[in-house]
Amino acid sequence: MAIGALVVCLSGPRLWAGQAKPLAVLEGKLLSTRGDCPLLQIGGREQTLSANTPYLYQTLQDKRLDGREVRLEGLPQPDGSFQVHWLYTVHNGKLFKVRYYCPVCNIVALGPGNCVCCQQPTELQELPADKPQS
């Protein structure tokens, strides 16, 4: 019994089954106050944003981040939007992770809103991306 093999040669980077697409990077100013759709201002143009999780989309809509310089890592979508997978704020060229924290209950949350325990609003925190978080 003969076993055949199909060989396909592709130019460019090779991706194996199960390997994620390389993420694209966009940097600009986050505009989160214009309706429901967050935008990234890059130079003179505006890029519509989506996200791969609901909490990340809610973070992009957080008015406390409006006007902040950000670095977004994600994938361009067929509809022209940019699907964000990772969000960082940028201060003096350094990257910061965004998280939400309740100082009353000592609880960390992924997205904005009230604490799941005491129902008080969570605080926005920006933590250096190059340091381990506790």
Predicted regions and their residues:
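N-terminal export leaders
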Residues: 1-3
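Structural detector for short beta-strands of small beta-barrel domains
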Residues: 19-36
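OB-fold (S1/OB) nucleic-acid-binding surfaces
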Residues: 35-52
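Short, cysteine/histidine-rich loop/knuckle motifs that typically chelate Zn2+
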Residues: 103-104, 115-117
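Short Cys/His-rich micro-motifs in 6-15 aa windows
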Residues: 118-129
